[in-house]
Amino acid sequence: MSKMPKNQNLDIERKQDHIEINLMKNVASTLTSGFESMQFIHNALPEINYDSIDTTSTFLGKSLQAPILISSMTGGTTRAGDINYRLAQAAQKAGIAMGLGSMRVLLTKPDTITTFAVRDVAPDIPLLANIGAVQLNYFVTPKECQYLVDVVKADALILHLNVLQELTQPEGNRNWENLLPKIKELVNYLSVPVIVKEVGYGLSKKVAESLIGVGVKVLDIAGSGGTSWSQVEAYRATNSLQNRIASSFINWGIPTLDSLKMVREVSGDIPIIASGGLKSGIDGAKAIRMGANIFGLAGQFLKAADTSESLLSEEVQLIIEQLKITMLCTGSRTLKDLAKAEIRL
């Protein structure tokens, strides 16, 4: 296992804090995703049967019944394990993709595997392993990353970029130097594609170009408008200075729509996941229209999964129905049609 000089109990406590704060506190960015400024032109005569609306797509070589990702959230604790289990069941039932929360803890506490091992209840979906990119500067090796992929039978590995969150954590990692060459090394080593994901502050055109240049296969832009992780860390702060530093960045980041436009300029055939402040299947449809291949949501799924299986199932179905109704009301039989639907910005 990893040589990371980390306090194992601190990792677990942080994960517990993150779940509790996200469920109980207002941690929304003061920025918006930008999608509220965009409207579809309503088609009053679509000439399409609702039952023929086709939301299917493919991702990582697997079929999706809808272009939706349950974005990475949690793992490592008993409560997180229960949440992941419910999320995986819901993803399998709906035929959508799922990302696991950061798996760094698994490298120092192998017994936490039970909180991430959901493949048995979700055998058919695209399942994404996950670790912070900065950990490549803190003793995590490509071999260990491959282990994380193998142990959960993942279809890809997410490297999340959470620089602002790390810098607003008292125990956060500060060394972000020379990461790109390490990402390239990892891309060339792994048996599965590498996905790079922001965590709520957006990817710029320049960063996207750099990542594509080293072989990253999928980009999750995760722009602002949803959870502000600096605000989460403000609630975790143990003194006034830490709280004030973290709170000052609540309006930081690139709105998701702006990030999507930037990244689409340089992405070519690289799939884009649009996440960050999306609240509905209508927002998801807007993301598809603006160039995303699939869209991700987290917060509403987390709250539903922590409550009950039935509420989570309803939440997933709500998103899908909103997407399908939007497609019909724009005259879009397929996702390709939706990508060309009339809009007003």
UniProtKB/Swiss-Prot annotation:
Q: Which cofactor does it need?
A: FMN; NADPH; Mg(2+)
Q: Where does Mg(2+) bind?
A: E166
Domain of life the protein comes from: Bacteria
Gene3D superfamilies cross-referenced by the UniProt entry: Aldolase class I
The source organism is Rickettsia felis (strain ATCC VR-1525 / URRWXCal2)
UniProt entry tagged with the keyword Flavoprotein:
yes
| InterPro entries associated with the record | Aldolase_TIM (IPR013785), FMN-dep_DH (IPR000262), IPdP_isomerase (IPR011179)
Assigned keywords, A-Z: Cytoplasm, Flavoprotein, FMN, Isomerase, Isoprene biosynthesis, Magnesium, Metal-binding, NADP
Q: What is this protein called?
A: Isopentenyl-diphosphate delta-isomerase
Q: Does the record's keyword annotation contain NADP?
A: yes
GO BP field: isoprenoid biosynthetic process
Location in the cell reads: Cytoplasm
The beginning of the lineage is: Bacteria, Pseudomonadati, Pseudomonadota, Alphaproteobacteria, Rickettsiales
Biological function: Involved in the biosynthesis of isoprenoids. Catalyzes the 1,3-allylic rearrangement of the homoallylic substrate isopentenyl (IPP) to its allylic isomer, dimethylallyl diphosphate (DMAPP).
Residues bound to FMN are S71, S72, M73, T74, S102, N130, K197, T227, G277, L278, K279, A298, G299
> Which amino acids does the record list as binding substrate?
R14, K15, S102, M103, R104, Q165
